[in-house]
């Protein structure tokens, strides 16, 4: 079945535009996070930007060409503090997985496009995880827990791999002299 002239075609292009814009916003947010001393958060923004690029690419490949007129609202916000940017990103991801993609999937099903409905639903799963990660990182900033924890944990220097055990990441890595900004909780998930 052709997408031309369907609501699903408009929804795909709307989602493509939204994912593309999110990618750029997250790249800008990464730069701010890095400047504020949050290297791990900057890397998460960059990783998520690349994931949004993949979503946009999947959607773009579904389109059949030609011009499609869309009317949509997109965030035209500013680049705030890293905590502000995490909140804005989490709110956007929440909208995508709780409202936008489910409604787009419902329309696709009504139009007999089950395969596209499933794609919308799969992307929504990723957006839910993006929101969860952003909200957790925002909470860490607001509670002063990015580089300090209540219990002893293993901290890993993202630059050289040095591991320190303690409630707080070192102010300076004793192995490579990189600042605290480069430390994260050691995650062994292999």
Task: Please annotate each region the language model reported.
Residues 1-190:
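Non-heme di-metal
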């Amino acid at each position: 079945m052709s997408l031309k002239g369907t609501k699903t075609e408009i929804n795909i292009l709307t989602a493509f535009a939204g994912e593309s814009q999110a990618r750029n916003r997250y790249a800008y947010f990464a730069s701010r996070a890095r400047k504020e001393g949050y290297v791990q958060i900057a890397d998460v923004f960059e990783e998520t930007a690349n994931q949004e690029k993949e979503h946009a690419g999947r959607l773009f490949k579904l389109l059949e060409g030609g011009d499609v007129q869309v009317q949509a609202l997109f965030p035209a916000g500013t680049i705030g503090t890293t905590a502000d940017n995490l909140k804005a990103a989490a709110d956007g991801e929440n909208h995508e997985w709780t409202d936008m993609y489910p409604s787009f999937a419902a329309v696709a099903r009504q139009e007999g496009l089950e395969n596209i409905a499933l794609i919308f639903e799969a992307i929504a799963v990723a957006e839910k995880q993006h929101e969860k990660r952003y909200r957790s990182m925002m909470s860490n900033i607001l509670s002063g827990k990015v580089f300090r924890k209540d219990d002893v944990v293993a901290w890993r220097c993202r630059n050289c791999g040095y591991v320190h055990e303690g409630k707080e990441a070192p102010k300076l890595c004793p192995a490579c002299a990189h600042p605290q900004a480069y430390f994260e909780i050691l995650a062994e998930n292999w």
